[in-house]
């Protein structure tokens, strides 16, 4: 039997289900499973993948992923594909920044050819001089660096402009303010 197919982007993946937003639609999401062929090939769909789906039920908005279209890039941690840029969020204090980890993130993104922005959050917890010195190091290495206090909306507007219209993945250690930053952007 012939099933209607369409292309879309994976917006979320939870427990073997993938939520696909079809191209050229507004506010439509299909819940899909990946065909067994992907498991046999040890390929796993990732958030951000452009995929071909076949519709099982138009009414229930369910389908199967039948093809993963060519990827521009693929990040392993977090597992996400076809991003325009990565945003690495670190706190300048509380928790104290692990610059070794930050540098590893930057190297990993660079190896994938992903443009990377650095957002130093909680910049109110250190002196202006210390914040400037840290920013100068990474800006001097060619990165766009932002100082923010997400909970007080400080520095958020400039940061919002830098990510506007781009598919961005946020990464960083626990407790640095990634969720606060995403909330401040809304």
Predicted segments, located by residue:
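Signal for well-folded cores of large energy- and translation-related assemblies
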Residues: 11, 15, 70, 106-110, ...
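A conserved segment at the C-terminal end of the G1
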Residues: 179-186
